[in-house]
Amino acid sequence: MGKTRGMGAGRKLKQLRITQRWADKHYKKSNRGNEWKKPFACSSHAKGIVLEKIGIEAKQPNSAIRKCARVQLIKNGKKIAAFVPNDGCLNYIEENDEVLIAGFGRKGHAVGDIPGVRFKVVKVSGVSLLALFKEKKEKPRS
């Protein structure tokens, strides 16, 4: 049984197209309304307060402790784990610091061997973490 043909079939064809759209993965993701329930709620970055510094064990076959921070977002109070990139950058982050968090690749999925971590730290107290790491800037005294 194919699609309806004929001069009066417009409404039926339109209705069929609307129902079939929901079979498309990308359409479903953008129109279901779940984006607002995610921690960032449709934005690329978010500010948060560092609750604690944590080490997350890497998945097999790797063996390492990935340095992360537990962060509570200011906009909605949700608590997330954020990866701290580069060697020794965890030393620039203290508890109760304000950090800027961004996504970590893969469209909301965990990256590499770090289980359950979907975000990374970009700035600490308004200063880029990369600038602190390269010693181009200093962290402001609070």
From Swiss-Prot:
<keyword id="KW-0689">Ribosomal protein</keyword>
<dbReference type="InterPro" id="IPR006032">
    <property type="entry name" value="Ribosomal_uS12"/>
</dbReference>
<dbReference type="GO" id="GO:0006412">
    <property type="term" value="P:translation"/>
</dbReference>
<dbReference type="GO" id="GO:0022626">
    <property type="term" value="C:cytosolic ribosome"/>
</dbReference>
<dbReference type="InterPro" id="IPR012340">
    <property type="entry name" value="NA-bd_OB-fold"/>
</dbReference>
<comment type="similarity">
    <text>Belongs to the universal ribosomal protein uS12 family.</text>
</comment>
<keyword id="KW-0379">Hydroxylation</keyword>
<dbReference type="GO" id="GO:0022627">
    <property type="term" value="C:cytosolic small ribosomal subunit"/>
</dbReference>
<dbReference type="GO" id="GO:0005730">
    <property type="term" value="C:nucleolus"/>
</dbReference>
<dbReference type="GO" id="GO:0005829">
    <property type="term" value="C:cytosol"/>
</dbReference>
<keyword id="KW-0687">Ribonucleoprotein</keyword>
<protein>
    <recommendedName>
        <fullName>Small ribosomal subunit protein uS12z</fullName>
    </recommendedName>
</protein>
<dbReference type="Pfam" id="PF00164">
    <property type="entry name" value="Ribosom_S12_S23"/>
</dbReference>
<dbReference type="InterPro" id="IPR005680">
    <property type="entry name" value="Ribosomal_uS12_euk/arc"/>
</dbReference>
<feature type="modified residue" description="Hydroxyproline">
    <location>
        <position position="61"/>
    </location>
</feature>
<dbReference type="GO" id="GO:0003735">
    <property type="term" value="F:structural constituent of ribosome"/>
</dbReference>
<dbReference type="GO" id="GO:0003729">
    <property type="term" value="F:mRNA binding"/>
</dbReference>
